[in-house]
Amino acid sequence: MARSDAFVILPVKAFVGAKSRLAPLLSVGERTMLARVMLNDVLDAAIAAVGPQSVSVVTSADDVADHARRAGVGVIDDEGARGTNAAVKVGFARIAARRRGAVLTLSSDIPGLIPSDIVALISAAERSRVALAPACDDGGTNALACDVVGRIPLCFGPGSFARHIAAANAADVRPAVLLNQRLGLDLDEPHHLMQFLDRGTSTQTDAYLRVLRLKERKGHSFVVAAQQATGARRLAV
């Protein structure tokens, strides 16, 4: 399945302090480990899709850089970038300086994705110039693939999917959109963890969350709220 003609980058912040919105449910140590195992799962999928030589993590965090090197992928210094847009822009510029072709940027908190999802995004970008995968909940963008040179303006953040569509249209591009639950579920909120566990994936993230026994933390109002939110989303589907 591996493709050597495309490149994947992942902007990643320091593990320590990651996933603050999960603080009501997980300790600092648990969130730190969760960030690590999620990155492992996303890197595994990317490596299987394009090969380790075509995957890089964009970061200025030493712990993340060391982790990426141990995984066998490249590291791009984000040059102190503030925010995802700035980090991805640095990554794209570094890739454009040494190669041409499609480049895909992925969130590091979508551990349910599989290699064929990445290949599908890259192939769609080659046909349509831009391919996007929206987040399920907040209207964000969990994946964006485009030509590394002819890319559209970056608009990551809540509500960014609509902004990316508008930016593509302004550039006279009709982007491909992949409505994919694996790509769409980023683990940001407590109820996302419950949704992810309900899918029963063969991932490091699934194994780690099951060790934590989240559903057995009875009496914790946030677990109850998370379970209720998951049920509500099922009814809405």
UniProtKB/Swiss-Prot annotation:
Q: Which GO terms describe its biological process?
A: F420-0 metabolic process
Report which superkingdom the organism of origin falls in: Bacteria
Q: Which pathway does it serve?
A: Cofactor biosynthesis; coenzyme F420 biosynthesis
Q: Write out the entry's keywords from A to Z.
A: GTP-binding, Nucleotide-binding, Nucleotidyltransferase, Transferase
InterPro entries (alphabetical): CofC (IPR002835), Nucleotide-diphossugar_trans (IPR029044)
Reaction(s) catalysed by this chain, per the record, are:
(2R)-3-phosphoglycerate + GTP + H(+) = 3-[(R)-glyceryl]-diphospho-5'-guanosine + diphosphate
Q: Does the keyword Transferase apply?
A: yes
GO MF annotation terms: GTP binding; phospholactate guanylyltransferase activity
Q: What does this protein do?
A: Guanylyltransferase that catalyzes the activation of (2R)-3-phosphoglycerate (3PG) as 3-[(R)-glyceryl]-diphospho-5'-guanosine, via the condensation of 3PG with GTP. It is involved in the biosynthesis of a derivative of the hydride carrier cofactor coenzyme F420, 3PG-F420.
Record-given protein name: 3-phospho-D-glycerate guanylyltransferase
Q: Which gene encodes it?
A: fbiD
